[in-house]
C-alpha cells in the first residue's frame, strides 16, 4: 500500500495540534519487496478512463481533486489503477478488508473493558485494532465505508465512547476512536450519517472530559469543522449544552475557558490545545447563525466575556505563537467590528455595556417618540415590582426575565431559535414551586425582627460605652501631650528668662558707667521683652523707664546687642525722633545684573505670552540665581525653530481657544462650619429640626411616637409653647430616648457618660427656652403635671442655672478637637508648601529652562527677561507647534527635560503639599481661628462665673471645664504660633519668586503651581500615549506583513503539491476544512476586510480599539 500524503493545508500547522506525527510504518509482510509490474498492457484511452472513473468514484474525491487526477497522463493513471486493484486483491489483507471484522472486535472490547484490568500489552493490541480501522476508513474504497455505515458501525463507535471506563478514557484508544469518527466524516456519506445521528455530536463532545490533550484537540477540531458544515452549527451548540449537564458545569463553555487559562507545563501540547480552543470559539461565533446575525454574535460572545475570556486572551499573547495570535487577532477584530456596528445603530462611537445608565439612556432616546415607548414604561414599571431582597427565588425570577429577552432577540422571522440555551431545561413552574412558603417566611421574619431590636438596643448601649471610653482616652492622651509640651515650654522660657535678666543687669551696669544722672536700663534690642506666662512675669522687677535718647546711632554702629553679634538688618530701629531709614525688600547692594546674551533665531518664532518681571524686582529672588545662558548651549535651537516657526499658520496658533481650565477647587472655606457655642442657637432655623422626623419608634417608651400621640389626645394637657416648635422639640426628645431628668443630669455632669452626641447637642441648642417662654412657664409651674411634653422639658431645663451658657460650653468642648483638626492641616499645608517651593532645586532648574526658551522666542518688550511672573507658567501650553497642533510648548519642554535634564522630571515629588495648600483660603482660615478664640474666651467667662456660685453636688462644670481650658488654651496657642509662622514663610515664598505679598493669597499662589504640575503630568502622559500608539501601529504593520508573507508561502506550497501529482493520496474535504480552521485560513477573507475598513480615512475603529483596551479590565 502506497503511503498516504498529508493534506497541504495542514503543512506547517498540524504540528500545533499534535496531528503532525508521521504514521508508524510496520512491515510485517514476509514477502520480499518487489518492483511493481503491470498486469497487462495499457488499455485504450476510453477503457482506461472508464476503469479509472470507477476507482475515483470509490475514493469519493472532491470535484477539485477529481479534475486534478483526470488530468494525469495515461501511464500515471494505469499505474495508480493497477496499484489499487492489487492492493484490494491482496489475500493477506482479506480478513481486515471487511468492516464486520472491526465492528466485532470493537464490540468485544466494549464488553470486556469493565470485566478485568487490562495490561499494557493488551491495551496496545486494542489500540492497534482501532488504528487499523481508522486507516481503513481513510484508504479503503467507498464500498467499505458504505458497508461500515450499513452495519451500524457508527453506533458501535458511539456506544464504546459512551460506556468506556476511566482508564480507557485516558488512554490512546480514546484518541484513536475520535480519529475513526473523524476519518468517517472525511467523505460526504459518512459525514451525513454522523450528522443524522441525534446524539452523535453530543457523545463526541463528552470526550472533552479527559486529561489527554491530544484527545481534546481532536474533539475540538471535529466540533469546529462541524460548525462550518451546513446544519452543523446548531448541533454543536446543543452538544455544548449537553456537555454542560454531563460535566456539571455552572455555565456553558466553562470547561473550555478553564482549559484556555490553565497551564499544562509542556509548551507544544499547551499551544496545540489553546489554538484548537480558540479556533473552535471563532468557528462557533462566526459560523452558522453568526455569519449574518449580529445579535447572535453579541449574545454568544457575551457568554465568553462573562466567563472572563478577555484577560485570558491578553495572557495568551505571551506564547508568541503565530497561529495562536492569528486566532486571537480575529476574535478581537470581529468583536471590535460588532461593537462598532451596534454603536452605529444608536449614532454612537462606543457603547459601554457595563454601564446600565448609558444603555438605558440609549434605549430611552431610541423609543421616546415611538409607539413602543409605553411598552418600555410598562416594562420598567413592572421591573420596579420585581423582588429585590436576597431571599426566596428572586434570582431565578430575574434570570427568567433575562432568558426570555434573550430568546426574543435570538428568534428569527420564522420563529427558529439558533441557540436553545436561554430556555433549555428551564421550567417556570418548577422555579415558582421552589419559593419558600410564605407563612414560614413570615414566622422567621418576626423572630428575626425581635432579635434585631434586641441587638440594636445592646449595640446602642455598647456604642455609648465605647464613646465614653474613647472620649476619656483621647482626653487623657491630649492632656499628657499638653503637659509634656508645657514642661518643655516652661523649661525653655525659664532659660530665656535667666538670659534676659542677665542681659538687663549688664545693660544697666553699662549705662550707669557711661552716663551721669539717674538713668534706667533700656529695653532689650528688638522690642520690649515679652513672656508668654503671667506667672513668670510677676517675678520680674518693674521695668525702668526708657532712656531719653535723642536719636539712634548711625547704621554702621547699631546699638550693642545683649552679649552677642550686632542686630540683623531686619531688626526694628531704636526709638528715634528722626525718620527711620527706608527699607525696600527688593533693593540690594549687589552687583548690577549681567547683560543677556541670547542667540537669535534665523526666522521669526511664535511668542511665549509671559508677563516679564521688572529688572528692579529681580534682586533677592530666585531669578537672581538663574543663568539661562547655560541652557542655550544644550538646546537644539534648529529643531526648536522648526517646531515653533511663526510662518506656518501663525494666526491660527495664536488665536486658539482660551486656556483649558483646571478643576481645582480652591474655595477653602466653602463648607460652612458651626459657630462657636457662644454664638449658636439664637440664629438657627427650624428647618433642620424638621428633618429629624423618623419612621422608627414603635416601642412604647418615654418620648416615643406612640407616647406623643397618646399625650396629644389628653383633654387636660397644658401647652404655652408655639405648636410647631413644640412638635419639633418632641421629635428631638424621642430620638434622644432620655427622660428630662437624665438630660438634666447629663448637662450638669458635662456628659461624662457620653449620653449626648454632638449632633444631638447641636439640636438642643435650637430649643433653649427664651425669656417669654420662661415667663409663661413660671406662671403655670403649679400645673407642671398637666404640662405637655415639650413645655415640661423647657421648664425643667430653665431651672438649670445658666443653661444656655452650659450647653454652649459643652458643645464647644465636644467640637473643639474636631475644629482644631480641621484648621491644623490647612496651616501646615501653607507652611510646608512654602518651604517646598523655596527649597526645590528641580523647580529652579526648570524655571531656568523656561526662561531660556522664552527669551529665545520673544522679541521686543517681552524679550531679554531676567525673570517672569509665576502665573506665566500656565500659559506655556497655549503656544502650539507649527508642525503638529497636538504638540504644545509644554510637550516640547518635557521632551527637552527628558533628553537633557531627566532629574527635573521628578519635580512633583518635591512639591507634595501644593494641592492641599491651593485649597486653603487664608481669610476663611483666619475666620476659623477667630471663632475658636472667641469660643475659648466665652468658656473662660462662664468658668469664672461658675466658680463664684454655690454648686450642686452633681455639678461637674468647674472641674471638667478647668481641665479643658488648660489643655485647649495651650493647643490653641500652638495653632496661632504655627499660623504666624505660615504667614511668614508664605511672605518669604512670594518674595523668593518676585511676587508682591499684598496682591496674592495662598490659594492663588499655590494654585498656579498646582495647576502647572497637573498640566505637566498630563503632558507627560500625552507624550507616553503618543509613543505607545506609534509602537502599536508599527507592531501591527509588522504582523500584517508577516501574515501576508506566510499565506503566500502556504499557497505556493499547496500549488506545488498539486502539480506534483499527489492529489489522489490527499485526505478528504473534511480534513481540508479542519486544516483551514487550524491555520485560520477560513477567516482570512474577514480579516482582510476588517483591516481594509480600519485603514479607511475617517474610520473610527482605532477609537473603539482604545475603548476596548479599557473595557478589557471589566471582564
Curated annotation (Swiss-Prot):
Disulfide bonds: none
PROSITE patterns the record matches: DAD (PS51231), FH2 (PS51444), GBD_FH3 (PS51232)
Pfam families: Drf_FH3, Drf_GBD, FH2
Disruption phenotype: Conditional knockout mice lacking Daam2 in myocardial cells do not show any heart defects. Conditional knockout mice lacking Daam1 and Daam2 in myocardial cells show cardiomyopathy, which is stronger than with a single Daam1 deletion.
Ranges annotated as biased composition (Pro residues): 540-583
Entry keyword Coiled coil: yes
InterPro entries from the UniProt entry: ARM-like, ARM-type_fold, DAD_dom, FH2_Formin, FH2_Formin_sf, FH3_dom, Formin_Homology, GBD/FH3_dom
Limits of the FH1 domain: 518-694
Tissue expression from the record: In early embryogenesis, expression is confined to embryonic ectoderm. Highly dynamic expression in later stages of gastrulation. In early somite stages, detected in posterior node and persists until 9-10 somites have developed when expression is concentrated in the chordoneural hinge. During organogenesis, expressed in the CNS, PNS, liver primordia, limb buds and genital tubercle.
Ranges of residues in domain GBD/FH3: 40-416
Keyword annotations of the record: Coiled coil, Wnt signaling pathway
Domain DAD intervals: 1065-1095
Entry's Gene Ontology molecular function annotations: actin binding; small GTPase binding
Region named Disordered: 510-605, 655-697
Domain of life: Eukaryota
Keyword DNA-binding: no
Signal peptide stretch: none
GO biological process, one term: actin cytoskeleton organization
Domain notes per entry: The DAD domain regulates activation via by an autoinhibitory interaction with the GBD/FH3 domain. This autoinhibition is released upon competitive binding of an activated GTPase. The release of DAD allows the FH2 domain to then nucleate and elongate nonbranched actin filaments.
Its job: Key regulator of the Wnt signaling pathway, which is required for various processes during development, such as dorsal patterning, determination of left/right symmetry or myelination in the central nervous system. Acts downstream of Wnt ligands and upstream of beta-catenin (CTNNB1). Required for canonical Wnt signaling pathway during patterning in the dorsal spinal cord by promoting the aggregation of Disheveled (Dvl) complexes, thereby clustering and formation of Wnt receptor signalosomes and potentiating Wnt activity.
Family, as annotated: Belongs to the formin homology family.
Record note on quaternary structure: Interacts with DVL3. Interacts with INF2.
Entry protein name: Disheveled-associated activator of morphogenesis 2
Source species of the chain: Mus musculus
Amino acid at each position: 500500500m502506497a503511503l498516504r500524503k498529508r493534506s497541504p493545508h495542514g503543512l506547517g500547522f498540524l504540528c500545533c495540534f499534535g496531528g503532525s506525527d508521521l504514521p508508524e510504518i510496520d512491515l510485517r509482510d514476509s514477502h520480499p519487496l518487489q518492483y511493481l509490474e503491470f498486469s497487462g498492457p495499457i488499455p485504450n484511452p476510453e477503457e482506461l478512463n472508464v476503469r479509472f472513473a470507477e476507482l475515483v468514484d470509490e475514493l469519493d474525491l472532491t470535484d477539485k481533486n477529481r479534475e486534478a487526477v483526470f488530468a494525469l497522463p495515461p501511464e500515471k493513471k494505469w499505474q495508480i489503477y493497477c496499484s489499487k486493484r492489487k492492493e484490494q486483491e491482496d489475500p493477506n489483507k482479506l480478513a481486515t478488508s471487511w468492516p464486520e471484522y472491526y465492528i466485532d472486535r470493537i464490540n468485544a472490547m466494549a464488553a470486556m473493558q469493565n470485566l478485568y484490568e487490562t495490561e499494557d500489552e493488551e491495551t496496545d493490541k486494542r489500540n492497534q485494532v482501532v488504528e487499523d480501522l481508522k486507516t481503513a476508513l481513510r484508504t479503503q474504497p467507498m464500498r467499505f465505508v458504505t458497508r461500515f455505515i450499513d452495519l451500524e458501525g457508527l453506533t458501535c463507535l458511539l456506544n464504546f465512547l459512551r460506556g468506556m471506563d476511566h482508564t480507557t478514557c485516558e488512554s490512546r484508544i480514546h484518541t484513536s476512536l475520535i480519529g475513526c469518527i473523524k476519518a468517517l466524516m472525511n467523505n460526504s456519506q459518512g459525514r451525513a450519517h454522523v450528522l443524522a445521528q441525534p446524539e452523535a455530536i453530543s457523545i463526541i463532545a463528552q470526550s472533552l472530559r479527559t486529561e489527554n490533550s491530544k484527545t481534546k484537540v481532536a474533539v475540538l477540531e471535529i466540533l469546529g469543522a462541524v460548525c462550518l458544515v451546513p446544519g452543523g452549527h446548531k448541533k454543536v451548540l446543543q452538544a455544548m449544552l449537553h456537555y454542560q449537564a454531563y460535566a456539571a458545569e455552572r455555565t456553558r463553555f466553562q470547561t473550555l475557558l478553564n482549559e484556555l487559562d490553565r497551564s499544562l507545563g509542556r509548551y507544544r501540547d499547551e499551544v496545540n490545545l489553546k489554538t484548537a480552543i480558540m479556533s473552535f470559539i471563532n468557528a462557533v461565533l462566526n459560523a452558522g447563525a453568526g455569519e449574518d446575525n449580529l445579535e447572535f454574535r453579541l449574545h454568544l460572545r457575551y457568554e465568553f466575556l462573562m466567563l472572563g475570556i478577555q484577560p485570558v486572551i491578553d495572557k495568551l499573547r505571551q506564547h508568541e505563537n503565530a497561529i495562536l495570535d492569528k486566532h486571537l487577532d480575529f476574535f478581537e477584530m470581529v468583536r471590535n467590528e460588532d461593537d462598532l456596528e451596534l454603536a452605529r445603530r444608536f449614532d454612537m462611537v462606543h457603547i459601554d455595556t457595563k454601564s446600565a445608565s448609558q444603555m438605558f439612556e440609549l434605549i430611552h432616546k431610541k423609543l421616546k417618540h415611538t409607539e413602543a415607548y409605553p411598552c418600555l414604561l410598562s416594562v420598567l414599571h413592572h421591573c420596579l415590582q420585581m423582588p429585590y431582597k436576597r431571599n426566596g427565588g428572586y434570582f431565578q425570577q430575574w434570570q427568567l426575565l433575562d432568558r426570555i429577552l434573550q430568546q426574543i432577540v435570538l428568534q428569527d422571522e420564522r420563529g427558529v431559535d439558533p441557540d436553545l440555551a436561554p430556555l433549555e431545561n428551564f421550567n417556570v413552574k418548577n422555579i415558582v414551586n421552589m419559593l419558600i412558603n410564605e407563612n414560614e417566611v413570615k414566622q422567621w421574619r418576626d423572630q428575626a425582627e425581635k432579635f434585631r431590636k434586641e441587638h440594636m438596643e445592646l449595640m446602642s448601649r455598647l456604642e455609648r460605652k465605647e464613646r465614653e471610653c474613647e472620649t476619656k482616652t483621647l482626653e487623657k492622651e491630649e492632656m499628657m501631650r499638653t503637659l509634656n509640651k508645657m514642661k518643655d515650654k516652661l523649661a525653655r522660657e525659664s532659660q530665656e528668662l535667666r538670659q534676659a535678666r542677665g542681659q538687663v543687669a549688664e545693660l544697666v551696669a553699662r549705662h550707669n558707667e557711661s552716663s551721669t544722672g539717674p538713668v534706667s536700663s533700656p529695653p532689650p534690642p528688638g522690642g520690649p521683652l515679652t513672656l508668654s506666662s503671667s506667672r513668670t512675669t510677676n517675678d520680674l522687677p518693674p521695668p525702668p523707664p526708657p532712656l531719653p535718647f535723642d536719636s539712634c546711632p548711625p547704621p554702621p554702629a547699631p546699638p550693642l546687642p545683649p552679649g552677642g553679634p550686632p542686630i540683623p538688618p531686619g531688626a526694628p530701629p531704636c526709638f528715634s525722633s528722626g525718620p527711620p531709614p527706608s527699607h525696600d525688600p527688593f533693593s540690594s547692594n549687589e552687583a548690577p545684573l549681567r547683560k543677556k546674551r541670547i542667540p537669535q533665531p534665523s526666522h521669526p518664532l511664535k511668542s511665549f505670552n509671559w508677563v516679564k518681571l521688572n529688572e528692579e524686582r529681580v534682586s533677592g529672588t530666585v531669578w537672581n540665581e538663574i543663568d539661562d545662558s547655560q541652557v542655550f548651549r544644550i538646546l537644539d535651537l534648529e529643531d526648536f525653530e522648526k517646531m515653533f516657526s511663526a510662518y506656518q499658520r501663525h494666526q491660527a496658533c495664536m488665536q486658539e481657544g482660551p486656556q483649558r481650565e483646571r478643576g481645582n477647587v480652591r474655595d477653602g472655606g466653602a463648607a460652612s462650619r458651626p459657630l462657636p457655642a457662644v454664638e449658636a442657637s439664637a440664629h438657627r432655623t427650624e428647618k433642620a429640626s424638621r428633618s429629624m422626623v423618623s419612621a422608627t419608634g414603635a416601642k412604647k417608651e418615654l418620648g416615643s411616637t406612640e407616647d406623643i400621640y397618646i399625650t396629644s389626645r389628653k383633654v387636660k394637657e397644658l401647652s404655652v409653647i408655639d405648636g410647631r416648635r413644640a412638635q419639633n422639640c418632641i421629635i428631638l426628645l424621642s430620638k434622644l430616648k432620655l427622660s428630662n431628668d437624665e438630660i438634666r443630669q447629663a448637662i450638669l455632669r458635662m456628659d461624662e457618660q457620653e449620653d449626648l452626641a454632638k449632633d444631638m447637642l447641636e439640636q438642643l441648642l435650637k430649643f433653649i427656652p427664651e425669656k417669654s417662654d420662661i415667663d409663661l412657664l413660671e406662671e403655670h409651674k403649679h400645673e407642671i403635671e398637666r404640662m405637655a411634653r415639650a413645655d415640661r422639658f423647657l421648664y425643667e431645663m430653665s431651672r438649670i442655672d445658666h443653661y444656655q451658657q452650659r450647653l454652649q460650653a459643652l458643645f464647644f468642648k465636644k467640637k473643639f478637637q474636631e475644629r482644631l483638626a480641621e484648621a491644623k492641616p490647612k496651616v501646615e499645608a501653607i507652611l510646608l508648601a512654602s518651604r517646598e517651593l523655596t527649597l526645590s532645586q528641580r523647580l529652579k532648574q526648570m524655571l531656568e529652562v523656561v526662561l531660556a526658551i522664552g527669551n529665545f522666542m520673544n522679541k521686543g518688550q517681552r524679550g531679554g527677561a531676567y525673570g517672569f511672573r509665576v502665573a506665566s507658567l500656565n500659559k506655556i501650553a497655549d503656544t502650539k507647534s507649527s508642525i503638529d497642533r497636538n504638540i504644545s510648548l509644554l510637550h516640547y519642554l518635557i521632551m527637552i527635560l527628558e533628553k537633557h535634564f531627566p532629574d527635573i522630571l521628578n519635580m512633583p515629588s518635591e512639591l507634595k503639599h501644593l494641592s492641599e495648600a491651593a485649597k486653603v483660603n487664608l481669610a476663611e482660615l483666619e475666620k476659623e481661628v477667630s471663632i475658636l478664640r472667641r469660643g475659648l474666651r466665652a468658656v473662660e467667662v462662664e468658668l469664672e462665673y461658675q466658680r463664684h456660685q454655690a454648686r450642686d453636688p452633681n455639678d461637674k462644670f468647674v472641674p471638667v471645664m478647668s481641665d479643658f481650658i488648660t489643655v485647649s488654651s495651650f493647643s490653641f496657642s500652638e495653632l496661632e504660633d504655627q499660623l504666624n509662622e505660615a504667614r511668614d514663610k508664605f511672605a518669604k515664598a512670594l518674595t523668593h519668586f518676585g511676587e508682591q505679598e499684598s496682591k496674592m493669597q495662598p490659594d492663588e499662589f499655590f494654585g498656579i503651581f498646582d495647576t502647572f504640575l497637573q498640566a505637566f503630568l498630563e503632558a507627560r502622559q500625552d507624550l507616553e500615549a503618543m509613543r505607545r500608539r506609534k509602537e502599536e501601529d508599527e507592531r501591527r504593520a509588522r504582523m500584517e506583513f508577516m501574515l501576508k508573507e506566510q499565506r503566500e508561502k502556504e499557497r505556493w506550497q499547496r500549488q506545488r503539491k498539486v502539480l506534483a501529482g499527489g492529489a489522489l493520496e490527499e485526505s478528504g474535504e473534511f480534513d481540508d476544512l479542519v486544516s483551514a480552521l487550524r491555520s485560520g485560513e477560513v477567516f482570512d477573507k474577514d480579516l482582510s476586510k476588517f483591516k481594509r475598513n480600519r485603514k479607511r480615512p475617517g474610520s473610527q475603529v482605532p477609537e473603539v480599539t482604545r475603548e476596548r483596551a479599557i473595557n478589557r479590565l471589566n471582564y
